[in-house]
C-alpha cells in the first residue's frame, strides 16, 4: 500500500510534495498514483528505442515536471538528467536511461500493490 512512509523510503521528499498539495495527504497520494499511470513513461521508452529524439524529449520533459511537482525525487532527477541530454542532443544511447525511469516507476507501483 502506498503511504507517506513508503514514499519516504523510496526517496521522495514527501514534505515538499505534500506542501504542493495543500498538505492534503489523500490528495497527494491520489496525485502520485495518477502520475504512475502517465502514458509518457511508455512513450519515452518507445521514442528512445526508435531514436525519435523529439518525442523522447517531450515525454521526458513532461515527466520531469509532473514528478518534480510531486517531489518524487529519484524519478524526477533521472527524468531531469535525461531531459537535458535530449535537449542538448548529446550523442548516446538513451534507451537505458529511459528504461531506468520506467523501472523506478514500476518499483513505486509495486509498493502500491
Residue ranges with predicted function:
Residues 1-113:
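Two-component system phosphorelay core
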